[in-house]
């Protein structure tokens, strides 16, 4: 290899010594432009280009270097460039070694400039050129390694320094690209001589200790440099001076008029709609029809030209939240002079709906067949489509939160309440209007769900059982707790940089997982059709499975008791929608309560098992056991439930409402609901109604449970009276638990249960809500207050989110503290209880181990309490959003999972005198949230002795009845809370003492803890034996939390020397905080890392180490779901992840183990094939129903719309990569789509430019469609004026891309023919429109737009008009690459492209200065837009 290099050096010396290249290239091989700033190369050969860049005569122009490495790939290969630079380097060494002084000076200057070129190339374009090309890396390393001998001997020292710097540059870049590759540290290179002699190996040549090839992982920097367009654009701009303001070329006033006309025509036909814009000549091409028209054909209708033949609907923002609703909630006045505003309730229903009787003959007919009942029909159809069931009456499936959010954010209904408005205009607007275009977007997603349900029905029908949706598919589609948190409960959104506009509801992932589920279910159905049904296994083998199903059904059954008063917190008019049996508008059984304000109710927590369901059925077990997993948590039943759980969206806190319905036929369906008295008795542990939370024990005749008065109980809940229609009457006495002086408990009143059957379920009084227990019942809970001797307790339902919470101690077991005193436990019978001796021995052994562990924990707890390390207070008035970590992790006593046992020692016999003075709200972790601010949080933990005594408990006796308990903890089971805790300020999160709920969020706490404990590469939560990670956690805690360090030092047993001091810079690295200085010192080899003392052993000997390890372990970080570290403040977006992983550099280039893609990867093509089967069939969304359409833009003010459109366009432009622009990587024709969802499915095949163009054209189509579908002249006038105002605000925000979208749409032939609406436009708005209309003029090749783009104020932000840049690049691309083929390069062409690209990416980067908050509701509507097809527009405009 070195011999080859010598040959190249000889040939290079001969070429660069020629007269045309020495000392600088002559005019015969290179041409410069006359005048201008700096040197502008017009044409040259490749050798002359290298000679000019390394010329020892001309001045250094760093911008010329940067431009060259951006464009050289268009006419020169990377390997050829490396050969030329090697030849120039060797030629310089030859000149230095010559005897002449002049030649030596020329050689030294040329050598330095050649080194600068090589270093610039390696550092800035390693990921672009060297990373994917192994041969190029090997060639470069062979060249650099061969310079070690040439630099020795009698050569000048400058040569040795350059060689060492070049090797350090390579090592520095390698350390940036790979995470675990540090050549300097690994090979101990500490001197210049060591660097000279060191032979740099390639990453593919490194071996492990076992002799295997090392598998190095690419760093985050490498992946971003390879796949993230925004990061790559920012890296390119960093190579230039920040003060540079790159300009677009502007034509002179005296340019050729004929040429300008030619450019005008050709530019318009490239990207925009020539036949739609009045600024361009219209064509007579007929639109192509690819779909069957959903409307009758009219041959006599006059044909006009309308939207372009290619609907390049935007591809860009594939993942922002669905449009919140296609309905209008408020009409803002179109102009300031119009003092008129209509307020619309999106959940309003005309009074006739409330009077709807259950009898079909008594129902009142609406005025229009497509009135509000069409709206309710759509909602009901979507709701029922979400449920996977066998019969229409079966409502046992759970509605996916993501799909409910989709409907919630998309659908809205217009209703007008105008006390001072134009009465005549109000009468002309129907109260049942909604945005049909937005509803179409929902319908497309619902189509996929329908297909999934149909396939699921086939699968389950073959099995002869109730359909159960695949839990894995559901979990993959809708992630658990953290990802399902309500959007309003997220951390407050900052500026747009902290908000992922492209990924709001993650619709791309939702659609992908639905399609994956459909394909998997289809394969399963085809496979099961050929299988022979096998007989069920023996009953003995089914017991574990049956037990699992029994437990699962019991835990979910308890959810049915989460009751609340039959009232509403919000008094505004709203629509109450019960799920109908079908999508039919006249379906029977739908009724609306007239006594209360109606509400829109989305059912997200339907019951799996009902209070009337029998828990155990041997035959059912035999039928289902072979198909049920041991850990199955989804057990469904075809019988209708007694209650429906609903969630309202009228308030920030969702209320769970439990209503009984459809019980008239329940008794005959459950005649076998009585208990079998021959079954063995199961003793229930005190305070635990969930079977998962207590141990199974054999019952003996002498046990206290044997003497308990037996009542009919429900096996799934432990509730008395397990008959199908048993309802607890509101008049029944409520048992009150009292404690006598001797410590025994008794009930004050014994409730009586009556079996009642009601035919009219809606005539009942609302049920008394049952007790709400804390969701985490570890080592006892507040249930001790009322579960002592209650013979018939109402079951205590767990919080629905408990399954996602961390509920076990670090040991993974659940223990229950037993209290002294005579008591009896409620009993229930278990059909599966094993009374054999072996089972009894195991039970006794487990009980002994449990007691031993409890004793150890009590001892450890006592030791920690006496240490005195409690200084922080638990104050609600704090300004921080979370409690300090040292309070959270002070001791095991303060752990969230250990605090539940604190309240078990509260006695029940104290006076309740202070009950009415200050109501107490029970925390799910046992923290007294009503304590005064002056009380210390540690004080609540340091007095266990006082708490055990009734006389010392100030809060005892406050909740002695079920009613009192419920009143003070009525929010404890809110489904959207993390652990069911709400303080006085409405803050429902545990560790957030802020004043409002907006400052508190579980994700905030998670991110705080993650930042403090999970910043290391290895998992921060370590097992007890991982001492190294423990030391890192302790060190990080002390660095981030000074108070924790102070606490540690207060312990007299700890050695102060064991604490790791913060890292300090050495004397020679005083400026190491400057990244530029650090980089230079690393390149020169003068940077030395401060020595770190190994204090691991001393730390591990500290008694605090094991305590902290257990505390951190109890937080169970490994089971919590965190977003990826690279998107700390952003939601995960599968759409963005797919776009970032489409280009594989090599096997490890795009691997990211932190990416949580729950479902198997399915190509967009396969998903599109499923969506192609969709055809619009719902008549309510047909264009024949346009009289009920109203644009959602009338719901918001123009400034808000302009802001959200600006955020969207910023994200769109960030997807355009500089190299795609230089190469003009774009499709000649884009797919014809009419909705954003359809574009989502073209993610893998569209470049950033294609996305931007498609988004642009879709927006134009959408604006035209909104105006075409608005039949009311005044509403259309208002919509046009609203769009004019939006465009004007966008112009002020320097968002010229949106300005052009609106202007082109309003100036289209289709919209301009609405002369009756244009006549009503206000004169001031017409003046604004005339000014806006002049901006996109094609005269002189967008002369007006170019002047605006060249005069932008960077601080205000900017969204450039993409079409201007694409037209310039397209015109410039028609020039020749070579003036003389393969000899003389037309370098001016490529340098012009660079100037255009730099101007574009610079203005896109200026968009970061926008300070705009994302409005989730409006943003969703603006992103997930839908447009009419060209045929539909032609049909509507033909009359």
Curated annotation (Swiss-Prot):
<dbReference type="GO" id="GO:0007265">
    <property type="term" value="P:Ras protein signal transduction"/>
</dbReference>
<dbReference type="GO" id="GO:0005886">
    <property type="term" value="C:plasma membrane"/>
</dbReference>
<feature type="compositionally biased region" description="Polar residues">
    <location>
        <begin position="1054"/>
        <end position="1073"/>
    </location>
</feature>
<feature type="region of interest" description="Disordered">
    <location>
        <begin position="699"/>
        <end position="721"/>
    </location>
</feature>
<dbReference type="InterPro" id="IPR000651">
    <property type="entry name" value="Ras-like_Gua-exchang_fac_N"/>
</dbReference>
<feature type="domain" description="Ras-GEF">
    <location>
        <begin position="1197"/>
        <end position="1438"/>
    </location>
</feature>
<dbReference type="InterPro" id="IPR036964">
    <property type="entry name" value="RASGEF_cat_dom_sf"/>
</dbReference>
<dbReference type="Pfam" id="PF00618">
    <property type="entry name" value="RasGEF_N"/>
</dbReference>
<feature type="region of interest" description="Disordered">
    <location>
        <begin position="525"/>
        <end position="552"/>
    </location>
</feature>
<dbReference type="GO" id="GO:0016192">
    <property type="term" value="P:vesicle-mediated transport"/>
</dbReference>
<comment type="function">
    <text>GDP-GTP exchange factor component of the mitotic exit network (MEN). Fine-tunes the timing of the mitotic exit and couples this event with cytokinesis. May also be involved in proprotein-processing in the secretory pathway.</text>
</comment>
<keyword id="KW-0344">Guanine-nucleotide releasing factor</keyword>
<dbReference type="GO" id="GO:0005085">
    <property type="term" value="F:guanyl-nucleotide exchange factor activity"/>
</dbReference>
<dbReference type="GO" id="GO:0005933">
    <property type="term" value="C:cellular bud"/>
</dbReference>
<keyword id="KW-0131">Cell cycle</keyword>
<keyword id="KW-0498">Mitosis</keyword>
<dbReference type="Pfam" id="PF00617">
    <property type="entry name" value="RasGEF"/>
</dbReference>
<feature type="compositionally biased region" description="Polar residues">
    <location>
        <begin position="822"/>
        <end position="832"/>
    </location>
</feature>
<protein>
    <recommendedName>
        <fullName>Guanine nucleotide exchange factor LTE1</fullName>
    </recommendedName>
</protein>
<feature type="region of interest" description="Disordered">
    <location>
        <begin position="1041"/>
        <end position="1073"/>
    </location>
</feature>
<dbReference type="GO" id="GO:0061510">
    <property type="term" value="P:asymmetric protein localization to new mitotic spindle pole body"/>
</dbReference>
<keyword id="KW-0132">Cell division</keyword>
<feature type="domain" description="N-terminal Ras-GEF">
    <location>
        <begin position="37"/>
        <end position="167"/>
    </location>
</feature>
<dbReference type="InterPro" id="IPR001895">
    <property type="entry name" value="RASGEF_cat_dom"/>
</dbReference>
<dbReference type="GO" id="GO:0051301">
    <property type="term" value="P:cell division"/>
</dbReference>
<keyword id="KW-0963">Cytoplasm</keyword>
<dbReference type="GO" id="GO:0031536">
    <property type="term" value="P:positive regulation of exit from mitosis"/>
</dbReference>
<comment type="similarity">
    <text>Belongs to the LTE1 family.</text>
</comment>
<dbReference type="InterPro" id="IPR008937">
    <property type="entry name" value="Ras-like_GEF"/>
</dbReference>
<dbReference type="InterPro" id="IPR019804">
    <property type="entry name" value="Ras_G-nucl-exch_fac_CS"/>
</dbReference>
<feature type="compositionally biased region" description="Polar residues">
    <location>
        <begin position="699"/>
        <end position="711"/>
    </location>
</feature>
<feature type="region of interest" description="Disordered">
    <location>
        <begin position="790"/>
        <end position="832"/>
    </location>
</feature>
<dbReference type="GO" id="GO:0005737">
    <property type="term" value="C:cytoplasm"/>
</dbReference>
<dbReference type="InterPro" id="IPR023578">
    <property type="entry name" value="Ras_GEF_dom_sf"/>
</dbReference>
């Amino acid at each position: 290899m070195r011999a080859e290099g010598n040959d190249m050096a000889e040939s290079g010396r001969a070429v660069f010594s020629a007269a045309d290249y020495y000392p600088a290239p002559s005019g015969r091989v290179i041409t410069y432009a006359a005048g201008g700033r700096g040197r502008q190369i017009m044409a040259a050969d490749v050798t002359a280009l290298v000679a000019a860049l390394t010329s020892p005569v001309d001045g250094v122009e760093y911008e010329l270097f940067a431009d060259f490495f951006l464009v050289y790939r268009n006419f020169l290969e990377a390997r050829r460039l490396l050969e030329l630079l090697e030849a120039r380097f060797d030629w310089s060494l030859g000149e230095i070694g010559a005897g002449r002084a002049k030649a030596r000076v020329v050689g030294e200057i040329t050598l330095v400039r050649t080194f600068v070129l090589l270093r610039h190339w390696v550092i800035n374009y390693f990921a672009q050129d060297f990373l994917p090309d192994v041969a190029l890396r090997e060639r470069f390393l062979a060249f650099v390694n061969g310079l070690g001998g040439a630099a020795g001997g009698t050569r000048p020292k400058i040569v040795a320094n350059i060689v060492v710097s070049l090797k350090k540059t390579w090592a520095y870049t390698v350390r940036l690209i790979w995470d675990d590759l540090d050549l300097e540290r690994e090979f101990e290179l500490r001197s210049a001589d060591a660097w000279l002699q060191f032979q740099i190996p390639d990453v593919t040549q490194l071996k492990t200790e076992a002799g295997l090839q090392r598998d190095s992982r690419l760093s985050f920097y490498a992946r971003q440099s390879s796949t993230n367009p925004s990061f790559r654009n920012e890296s390119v701009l960093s190579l230039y001076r920040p003060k540079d303001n790159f300009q677009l070329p502007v034509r002179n006033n005296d340019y050729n008029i004929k040429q300008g006309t030619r450019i005008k025509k050709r530019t318009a036909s490239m990207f925009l709609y020539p036949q739609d814009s009045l600024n361009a000549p219209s064509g007579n091409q007929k639109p192509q029809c690819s779909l069957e028209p959903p409307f009758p054909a009219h041959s006599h209708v006059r044909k006009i030209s309308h939207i372009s033949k290619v609907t390049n609907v935007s591809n860009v923002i594939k993942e922002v939240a669905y449009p919140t609703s296609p309905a209008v909630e408020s009409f803002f006045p179109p102009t300031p002079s119009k003092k008129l505003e209509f307020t619309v309730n999106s959940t309003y229903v005309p009074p006739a709906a409330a009077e709807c009787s259950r009898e079909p003959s008594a129902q009142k007919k609406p005025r229009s067949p497509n009135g509000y009942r069409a709206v309710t029909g759509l909602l009901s159809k979507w709701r029922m489509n979400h449920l996977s069931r066998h019969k229409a009456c079966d409502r046992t499936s759970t509605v996916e939160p993501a799909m409910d959010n989709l409907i919630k954010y998309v659908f809205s209904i217009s209703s007008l309440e105008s006390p001072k408005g134009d009465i005549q205009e109000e009468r002309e607007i129907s109260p049942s209007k909604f945005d049909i275009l937005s509803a179409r977007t929902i319908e497309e997603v619902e189509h996929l769900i329908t297909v999934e349900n149909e396939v699921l029905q086939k699968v389950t029908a073959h099995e002869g059982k109730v359909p159960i949706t695949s839990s894995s598919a559901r979990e993959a589609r809708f992630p658990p707790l953290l990802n399902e948190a309500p959007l309003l409960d997220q951390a407050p959104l900052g500026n747009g940089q902290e908000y992922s506009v492209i990924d709001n509801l993650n619709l791309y992932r939702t659609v992908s997982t639905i399609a994956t589920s459909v394909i998997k279910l289809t394969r399963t159905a085809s496979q099961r059709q050929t299988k022979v049904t096998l007989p069920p296994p023996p009953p003995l083998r089914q017991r574990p499975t049956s037990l699992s199903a029994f437990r699962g059904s019991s835990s979910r059954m308890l959810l049915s008791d989460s009751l609340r008063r039959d009232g509403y917190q919000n008094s505004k008019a709203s629509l109450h929608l019960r799920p109908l049996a079908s999508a039919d508008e006249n379906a029977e059984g739908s009724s609306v309560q007239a006594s209360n304000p109606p509400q829109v109710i989305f059912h997200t927590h339907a019951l799996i098992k009902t209070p009337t369901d029998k828990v155990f059925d041997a035959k059912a077990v035999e039928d289902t056991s072979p198909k049920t997993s041991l850990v199955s948590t989804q057990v469904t039943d075809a019988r209708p439930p007694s209650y429906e759980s609903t969630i309202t969206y009228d308030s920030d806190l969702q209320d769970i409402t439990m209503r009984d319905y459809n019980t008239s036929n329940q008794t005959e369906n459950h005649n076998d609901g009585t208990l079998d008295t021959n079954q063995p008795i199961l003793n229930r542990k005190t305070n635990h109604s969930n079977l998962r939370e207590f141990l199974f024990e054999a019952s003996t005749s002498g046990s206290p449970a044997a003497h308990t008065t037996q009542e009919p109980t429900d096996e799934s809940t432990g509730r008395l009276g397990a008959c199908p229609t048993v309802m607890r009457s509101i008049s029944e006495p409520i048992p009150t638990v009292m404690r006598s002086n001797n410590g025994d408990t008794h009930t004050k009143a014994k409730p009586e249960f009556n079996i009642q059957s009601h035919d009219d379920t809606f005539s009942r009084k609302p049920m008394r809500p049952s007790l709400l227990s804390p969701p985490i019942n570890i080592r006892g809970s507040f249930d001790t207050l009322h579960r002592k001797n209650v013979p018939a307790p109402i079951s205590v339902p767990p919080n629905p989110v408990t399954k996602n919470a961390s509920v076990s101690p670090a040991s993974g077991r659940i223990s229950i503290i037993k209290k002294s005193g005579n008591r009896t436990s409620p009993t229930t019978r278990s059909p599966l209880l094993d009374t054999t001796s072996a089972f009894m021995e195991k039970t006794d052994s487990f009980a002994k181990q449990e007691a031993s562990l409890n004793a150890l924990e009590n001892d450890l707890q006592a030791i920690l309490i006496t240490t005195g390390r409690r200084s922080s207070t638990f104050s609600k008035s704090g300004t921080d959003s979370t409690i300090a970590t040292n309070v959270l992790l002070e001791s095991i006593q303060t752990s969230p999972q250990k605090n539940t046992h604190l309240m078990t020692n509260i006695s029940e016999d104290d006076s309740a005198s202070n009950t009415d003075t200050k109501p107490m709200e029970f925390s799910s972790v046992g923290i007294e949230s009503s304590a005064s601010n002056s009380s210390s949080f540690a004080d609540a933990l340091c007095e266990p002795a006082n708490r055990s005594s009734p006389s010392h408990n100030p809060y005892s006796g406050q909740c002695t009845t079920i009613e009192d308990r419920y009143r003070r903890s009525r929010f404890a089971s809110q489904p959207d809370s993390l652990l069911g805790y709400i303080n006085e300020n409405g803050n429902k999160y545990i560790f957030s003492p802020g004043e409002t709920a907006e400052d508190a969020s579980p994700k905030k706490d998670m991110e705080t803890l993650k930042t403090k404990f999970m910043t290391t590469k290895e998992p921060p939560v370590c097992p007890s034996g991982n001492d190294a990670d423990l030391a890192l956690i302790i060190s990080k805690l002390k660095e981030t939390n000074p108070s924790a360090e102070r606490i540690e030092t207060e312990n007299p047993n700890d050695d102060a020397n064991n604490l790791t001091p913060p890292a300090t810079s050495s004397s020679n690295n005083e400026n190491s905080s400057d990244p530029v200085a650090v980089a230079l010192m690393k390149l020169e080899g003068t940077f030395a890392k401060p020595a770190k003392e190994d204090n691991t052993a001393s730390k591990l000997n500290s008694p605090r180490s094991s305590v902290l390890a257990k505390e951190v372990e109890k937080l169970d970080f490994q089971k919590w779901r965190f977003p990826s570290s690279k998107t700390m403040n952003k939601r995960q977006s599968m759409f963005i992840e797919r776009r970032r992983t489409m280009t594989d550099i090599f096997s490890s280039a795009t691997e990211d183990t932190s990416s949580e893609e729950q479902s198997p990867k399915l190509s967009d093509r396969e998903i599109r094939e499923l969506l192609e089967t969709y055809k619009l069939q719902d008549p309510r969304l047909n264009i024949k129903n346009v009289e009920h359409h109203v644009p959602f833009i009338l719901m918001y003010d123009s400034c808000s719309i302009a802001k959200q459109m600006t955020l969207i366009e910023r994200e769109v432009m960030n997807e355009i990569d500089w190299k795609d622009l230089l190469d003009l990587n774009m499709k000649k024709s884009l797919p014809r789509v009419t909705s954003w969802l359809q574009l989502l499915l073209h993610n893998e095949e569209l470049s950033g430019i294609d996305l931007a163009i498609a988004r642009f054209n879709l927006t134009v189509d959408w604006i035209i469609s909104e105006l075409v579908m608005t039949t009311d002249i005044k509403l259309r006038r208002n919509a046009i004026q609203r769009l004019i105002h939006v465009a004007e605000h966008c112009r002020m925000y320097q968002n010229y891309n949106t300005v052009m979208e609106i202007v082109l749409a309003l100036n289209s032939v289709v919209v301009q023919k609405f002369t009756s609406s244009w006549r009503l436009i206000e004169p001031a708005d017409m003046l604004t429109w005339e000014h806006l209309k002049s901006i996109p003029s094609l005269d002189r090749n967008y002369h007006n737009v170019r002047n605006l783009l060249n005069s932008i104020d960077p601080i205000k932000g900017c969204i450039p008009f993409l079409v201007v840049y694409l037209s310039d690049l397209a015109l410039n691309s028609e020039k020749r690459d070579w003036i003389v083929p393969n000899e003389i390069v037309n370098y001016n062409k490529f340098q012009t492209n660079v100037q255009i690209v730099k101007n574009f990416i610079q203005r896109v980067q200026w968009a970061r200065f926008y300070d705009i908050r994302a409005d989730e509701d409006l943003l969703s509507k603006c992103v997930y837009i839908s447009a009419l097809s060209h045929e539909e527009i032609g049909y509507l405009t033909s009359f």
